[in-house]
Swiss-Prot record:
TM region(s), chain numbering: 3-23, 57-77
The name this protein goes by in its record: ATP synthase subunit c, chloroplastic
Miscellaneous comment text of the record: In plastids the F-type ATPase is also known as CF(1)CF(0).
Organism classification: Eukaryota, Rhodophyta, Bangiophyceae, Cyanidiales, Cyanidiaceae
Family the UniProt entry places it in: Belongs to the ATPase C chain family.
Primary localization class, coarse: plastid
Species for this entry: Cyanidium caldarium (Red alga)
Gene: atpH
Site entry (Reversibly protonated during proton transport), positions: 61
Highest taxon in the source lineage: Eukaryota
Keywords: ATP synthesis, CF(0), Chloroplast, Hydrogen ion transport, Ion transport, Lipid-binding, Membrane, Plastid, Thylakoid, Transmembrane, Transmembrane helix, Transport
Length: 82
């Protein structure tokens, strides 16, 4: 096993998880803030806002999980190591 390839794989795995968490983290914070603002303006639309918020948060969180899958495949099932 080449040490340069394994070191690059560890760095890439760390970057994959870190970068995959930044975008959804910012998006989830923004979505939650806008949902709270919408609830403050129209409390009667709580059910519709909550359902849409939970669905969008699940989609955003799936991006982070995909980054984790890429990182785990680089660490444990690396296609670049023969």
């Amino acid at each position: 096993m080449d040490p340069i390839i394994s070191a690059a794989s560890v760095i890439a795995a760390g970057l994959a998880v870190g970068l995959a968490a930044i975008g959804p983290g910012i998006g989830q914070g923004s979505a939650a803030a806008n949902a709270v603002e919408g609830l403050a303006r129209q409390p009667e639309a709580e059910g519709k806002i909550r359902g849409t918020l939970l669905l969008s948060l699940a989609f955003m969180e799936s991006l982070t999980i995909y980054g984790l899958v890429v990182a785990l495949s680089l660490l444990f099932a690396n296609p670049f190591i023969k």
